[in-house]
């Protein structure tokens, strides 16, 4: 069953073409990564799918229904979107942030239901938020903040989740923490589409990859089949080695040095040092 289908998407900012004929479909219950160099259209693509930008050309269907056939509130019950830099209300606690994920499911008077409470409690447990539940969201570390935002997304209880670089600016420990949480969400049956820069992390955690460059899909398929040396070299205009990681064999991408290391001079090569002991 297909969760989302995009056909022939085009988008331009004035005269700069950002997406040029992008087509793909997302299977349900998979973690799909979007990779590619800077300015390849990754974030723009997510914004189009989330109706943060208007469709200029092409079509998008969610669960077989045209994207524009949904009201914004109805769309928010089907699709959750976490941008790169989400806005945070001053002083909001983690508990309140997660509860906000239930807003699309509430009526005019925002009545709180037993289902709302159940989904919030589940998000709190899955994202392991007990220790920070009453803290100000603005006081959290990078990894804690991303887990709190993911808690809000999980409480929203949509089948389709779009994440724009949730691991950017995080150290390796917090990257792993966030990606384990994202993988857990997908393993529970959600379809997750994530923009990610770290190719090794993408290859290890994602079921499938969509490679973008110059606004076009360059490759799509199972992550470990897509992540080839030829593709990475071409996408990033570089030269890499791809090695299997110990244990699970996940691809480890290592860029080759473009120049030889400079030979370090010895003391004898400096006349002024001769005779010095």
Residue ranges and their predicted role:
Residues 50:
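Helix-to-loop junction immediately C-terminal to a conserved catalytic motif
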